[in-house]
Structures are given as structure tokens and as C-alpha cells.
Amino acid sequence: MILDSLETKEKILKEFLQTCAFDGWSKEALVKAAANCGIGENFLPLIFENGLLDLAEFYFESQNEKSAELLGSLEGKKIRDKISLSLYARFAVEKENKIALQRLINFYLNPKNFTSFEMGPRPAFQALQVCYNIADFIWKNIGDQSTDFNYYTKRATLGKIIFRAVSVFLKDGDVNNFIDVEIEKVMKFEKFKSKAKNLLAKNLLAKKTWDKKTFCEIFLNEKGSPRSPKEFVKNLPFFRLFS
């Protein structure tokens, strides 16, 4: 048996998902899982160098691959539908390991980690990184090829939805409905942002010079008197969107 092989990691993970239901996402559970696979505790650093953190990372990577297999082909579907279906599948593969996932979340949020020399803030940081990584996996899986600033905003936005959806999922809520609502919010905001940008461009950027007429339209009312602050703000293109 090759200690750091994929097969060895998968065997230990399979055992661990059973033991952690009783012992939590803990070193004790990991040692038991390894022992059940015939591997001594002293060999664990060769398999999972950073212990429970590396095990968690391996778990999420495995679950990502399973969700992609469950999802199948997305050819011909809209981006919004690809994202929704990808999230449905990602949480669907967690159903059989819901208890283990709850143990892992408890591990991430355990305040004792911050006073532990071995752990410190790393579990909390990994919790955020995991959400970003899952979002990154989903975007790449549906063929996203963005390389500009959108690359990061897409993943940050989707990662936030994933982060919030985990709580709904663990409380046995309708996670698919939650996903739909959150994506709809994002879509509405993007439409609003696009309209705001176009309106600002039309009303401000299109004017190459600020002539007397332009100045009067913005700063003076119909009677030729200076606009009050309230009137001025209300007349700005951005605020017109709310009227």
C-alpha cells in the first residue's frame, strides 16, 4: 500500500466519515479511521500533512467531483440555469454525509482553535476558502473563461451564496429554493447595475463639454433659481432609477 496514494486517502476518508459522527471532526476520529484501515497514527502526517485540514480539503475536492458526475451535461442551457443546477447537485451529494458536514462546520467554528498552537485561525480561514474553491470549481465546470476582474467577483458572489446555503441545508430547509431566491437577487442587481451604468453614460459621459445649458439643467430649477439639495440629489441619474 502506497501511503500517500489516492486510494489510501479515499479509504481513510470513508472510515472517517463514519467515526466522526460520534467523535466529531477530530484527531481521535482520524486516528480511529486510519487504524481501521491498518495504518498507524505515526504514518498519518505522510498521508495528510496538515491533519484534519488536509482531510477536509480532500473531502470537498472529492465531493466536487461527485457533483460534476451527478450533474452530467449542461450543453445548451443558460448560464443562470447552469449555476442553479450545479448548486443543486453540489448539495445533493452532501445529503448522505450531512452529519459529517455538521461536524466539520463545528470544527471550523470552534473558538478553541484560536487558542490552539496547532490550529490557530486556519480552520476559520479554510471555511471561507472552501466556499470560494467550490464556486471556482462550478464556474470552471460550466466553461467560464473570464480572466479580468469578473473572474474574482463571479467566484466571490457565488461563494457567498454557498456559504449561506450551507446553514439552510444543515437545518433541513429547502436549499434549492434558497438558491433560486439568492440567484434571482443577484440577477436583479446585475440588471440594475447595467441600467445605472447606461443611464450615467447617457446623461453624463455623452456630454463632452459642460456648456451653460448643461449647467442650468443640473443646478437650476424651472424658475432659474438654484435647486435645493433635495431637488439636486433627486435629479441625479442614479436616483432616477428609484422613481
Give the ranges of each region predicted by the language model.
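N-terminal intrinsically disordered/low-complexity leader segments
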Residues: 1-5, 216
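Short, amphipathic alpha-helix enriched in basic
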Residues: 5-32, 36-42, 50-57, 61
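Hydrophobic alpha-helical connector segments
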Residues: 6, 70-107
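C-terminal ligand-sensing/allosteric alpha-helical core of TetR-family HTH transcriptional regulators
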Residues: 82-93, 100, 123, 130, ...
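Amphipathic alpha-helical segments used for helix-helix packing
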Residues: 95-121, 129
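Amphipathic alpha-helical packing segments from all-alpha helical-bundle domains
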Residues: 115-144, 155-159
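C-terminal peripheral helix-coil segments that are non-catalytic and often amphipathic
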Residues: 172-243
